[in-house]
Amino acid sequence: ALNEVIEKYNESQPNVTAVPSYDSSGTLLAQIEEGAACDVFFSAAQKQMDTLQNDDQLVVDGTRHNVVNNQVVVITYKGSGTAVTGLENLKDAKNIAMADGSVPVGKYTRQALVNAGILDAVDDVSTIPTDVVSQALGGVEINECANVSAVKTQVAEGSNEVGTVYYSDTYGLEDKLDILQVVSYDLTGNVIYPIAQVKNDEADELEQKAALDFVNFVKSDAAKTIFDSYYFDTNVED
């Protein structure tokens, strides 16, 4: 979706080159903290943005905005014949692909399992180890993945029977994946993606201005139309 948003932005700003870097929000945050050049951070969760803003003091004041909401879905590959219908009987899977707790989709999956009464509540669900999740699901084998793309790939290729990803991750894979359950916000909480301009001492004034302009475009109606088409929920409060 972001590639298409960038293309749309370049229709009116052809002289601006936006170079996206895709990975889990935790990995991207770590790269920024380690000094990687970055002008804009678009996170799949509030936690990483909170860290960048409050702990690292690297968010430009007044530039943080909520862009989209997303939903966690339980997926399987076409023709899997799985007995799983959703989180409530996830234990019936032969094996599961699941992101670790440091990855937003892994955190939201754990939160949903806590709220569904499958996992015990803890102060920070992102700290729940994958082996504890496995035990709560009757010892089912879990393939711990480093990011949501890895989960999607493992299930689409049939390496794992089921997995949890974002609804938007199923875009373009409708012929390979079946959605078993769209997990309600009541279980996961909101899955808000915030965006902000990042303080970058290496950027000149023109680059900083372009970064802010791009942030503002991402929350525009033109960008929302694109996000909607990729199964994101754009009905969010800023």
Q: Residues of each region from the PLM?
A:
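Central helical "cap/lid" subdomain
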Residues: D56-H65
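A generic structural motif
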Residues: Q13-P20
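Ligand-binding clamshell of periplasmic/extracellular solute-binding protein-like
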Residues: P20-A30, A37-Q53
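Exported/periplasmic ABC-transporter solute-binding proteins
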Residues: A1-Q13, G26, E33, Q46, ...
